[in-house]
């Protein structure tokens, strides 16, 4: 049986509040994390992702207290990232109530963090996060770090392979070209990624309409679609989205 596709709201957290930027800048505050998480659970979200956007850029501590408060009220899986540098950081977040931990920039600097995290907590708890941007001159999707501000020499597809080989049980991949545009997911990127690895891939960046989700699931083998602003501002209602997907033949939990 095909695994049901997942709809995953993302909550970017700054100073304990939910915010959403366009292309990682121009932040706009949209609410309380616990209330937002409860509302998403009630609406039928399959999982939630939290990113502490202050952690990587300004060396802040991770969002332990937010995770603890949310996990007491919400029972769908929580994936948390931002500023995670050690397996001790991972352990503290898991103890606070996170089900999965995602690591982005630090995995590029220290790939053993993925290996060690998977050994200690299991692959199911470790998510490799990638910010990817098309590089026309090189003909590759290039990996960026530090909140999408610094290019690396890495090819995103090859890096995805390595993350999985090191023990990541899932990938969370953001298209920087599409992020914040509301013009649809980067079908080419996710088609390549979903074919390249044998773990679930969560697509992030570009959702602007219900049809964008339909296109993603119909044109790629992607497992989950992440979005933020279209959900935060009520532009797309999750129950309506799921009904449309189901009507279009997408395997989804209603």
Swiss-Prot record:
It is an enzyme of class 4 (lyase). It catalyses: 5-[(5-phospho-1-deoxy-D-ribulos-1-ylimino)methylamino]-1-(5-phospho-beta-D-ribosyl)imidazole-4-carboxamide + L-glutamine = D-erythro-1-(imidazol-4-yl)glycerol 3-phosphate + 5-amino-1-(5-phospho-beta-D-ribosyl)imidazole-4-carboxamide + L-glutamate + H(+). Heterodimer of HisH and HisF. IGPS catalyzes the conversion of PRFAR and glutamine to IGP, AICAR and glutamate. The HisF subunit catalyzes the cyclization activity that produces IGP and AICAR from PRFAR using the ammonia provided by the HisH subunit. GO terms for molecular function: imidazoleglycerol-phosphate synthase activity; lyase activity. GO terms for cellular component: cytoplasm. Belongs to the HisA/HisF family. GO terms for biological process: L-histidine biosynthetic process. Its main location: cytoplasm. Coiled coil: none annotated. This is Imidazole glycerol phosphate synthase subunit HisF. Its EC number is 4.3.2.10.
